[in-house]
């Protein structure tokens, strides 16, 4: 995993996986694998899958997709098991982005404030590189 700063203020964990380093063949396959890990987790709950590619494409001239990107989806989930203060809802739920390119997948997420949730997402993402 590498750490990057998106727009100079958002800490993101990201893993690029060359397609020959995984048995998964599409963004949907990866989303389904991570969803199965969420379903098996004692706290995490699956919320939705957002087809970011389809949404952006539907915007016509108002949308822009890099020619490198073949598919882009976000899996939305939540690890919240406590609400100690009102502003905690601002950092939830979590989103794991899966982008398919010609020769690789890029899987990324905004760093989580909860260290256990963050480590769990790192392990889920790393498990995609399974060859």
Question: What is each residue range found by the language model?
Answer:
Residues 22-29, 85-86, 117-119:
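Short, conserved charged micro-motifs
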Residues 32-86:
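Ser/Thr-rich, low-complexity intrinsically disordered terminal regions
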Residues 95-111:
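Beta-strand/loop substructures that line and gate deep hydrophobic ligand-binding cavities in soluble
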Residues 1-42:
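Terminal, regulation- and interaction-focused segments at domain boundaries
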Residues 4-9, 65-66, 95-100:
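Short, flexible, solvent-exposed loop/turn segments with mixed acidic/basic and small polar residues
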Residues 86-87, 99:
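Short active-site-adjacent structural elements
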Residues 90-94:
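Short, surface-exposed coil-to-beta transition loops
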Residues 112-131:
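C-terminal partner/receptor-binding element of secreted or periplasmic proteins
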């Amino acid at each position: 995993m590498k750490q990057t700063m998106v727009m100079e203020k958002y800490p993101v964990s990201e893993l690029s996986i060359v397609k020959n380093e995984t048995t998964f063949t599409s963004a949907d396959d990866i989303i389904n694998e991570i969803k199965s890990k969420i379903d098996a987790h004692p706290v995490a709950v699956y919320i939705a899958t957002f087809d970011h590619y389809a949404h952006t494409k539907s915007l016509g001239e108002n949308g822009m997709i890099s020619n490198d990107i073949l598919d882009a989806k976000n899996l939305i989930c939540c690890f919240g098991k406590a609400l100690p203060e009102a502003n905690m809802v601002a950092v939830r739920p979590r989103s794991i982005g899966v982008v398919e390119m010609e020769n690789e997948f890029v899987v990324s997420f905004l760093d989580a404030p909860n260290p256990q949730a963050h480590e769990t997402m790192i392990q889920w993402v790393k498990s995609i590189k399974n060859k």
